Amino acid sequence: MTVDVLIRAVNNPTSAQDLVKNVAQLAATKDEQAIPTLVEVLKFNNPGAAVAAVNGLINIGEAVVPYLLENVDGYNYGARAWMLRIFAGIGDPRALDLLIEAANKDFAFSVRRSAAKGLGNIQWHKVPDSEREVQQQKVCDCLFLALEDGEWVVRYGAIAGLEGLSQAIPEARKIVIKNKLTEFLTTEPEAAIRARIQKAILSLP
């Protein structure tokens, strides 16, 4: 089926299950023409279809980012939460400020976790040299704050984010992250988090 036919199928499903199937088929095309329709699906009350749309949009990649930034829905929280997951999955630096705010301030812990983890996935080579150090410091500060989150899954995401960030920063900054994680290891009550910290520390020099 052509992309046009698949788009019409998404817009005219016969059931909730049919919608999920149609979205998955459209997402599998990885066609930029599908972006507006897949983004619209995020506003539907159908988590299965939304997950398929999110995965499809992440697979399309950076071409999705400008459209998403123009269409972030501040009034539809569910759609906004899905969009943040897409930004986190793509790692485009144009969404940095949104991810930083979400990691520390979003009321849903699942969104905070996704944003924190996604901050370790930023494509730093796309950030101008003159801005990179400042932006990386902002991300580092954000993730250090996320380590204090009351929800353990957010702390877990922050550790993954710091581990990812450490692969893109100067050695001196890696030492700062390693020292912070070593300190955090002594106060973290959750065994799963402590194990994740130890894994992250081992990946650092």
Swiss-Prot record:
Recorded GO MF terms: lyase activity
EC number of this enzyme: 4.-.-.-
Signal peptide stretch: none
Keyword Acetylation tagged: no
One GO location term (cellular component): phycobilisome
Disulfide bond sites: none
Keywords: Antenna complex, Lyase, Phycobilisome
Function: Required for the chromophorylation of the cpcA gene product.
Assembly behavior: CpcE and CpcF associate to form a lyase.
Assigned protein family: Belongs to the CpcE/RpcE/PecE family.
Protein name (record): Phycocyanobilin lyase subunit beta
Protein's organism: Picosynechococcus sp. (strain ATCC 27264 / PCC 7002 / PR-6) (Agmenellum quadruplicatum)
Gene: cpcF
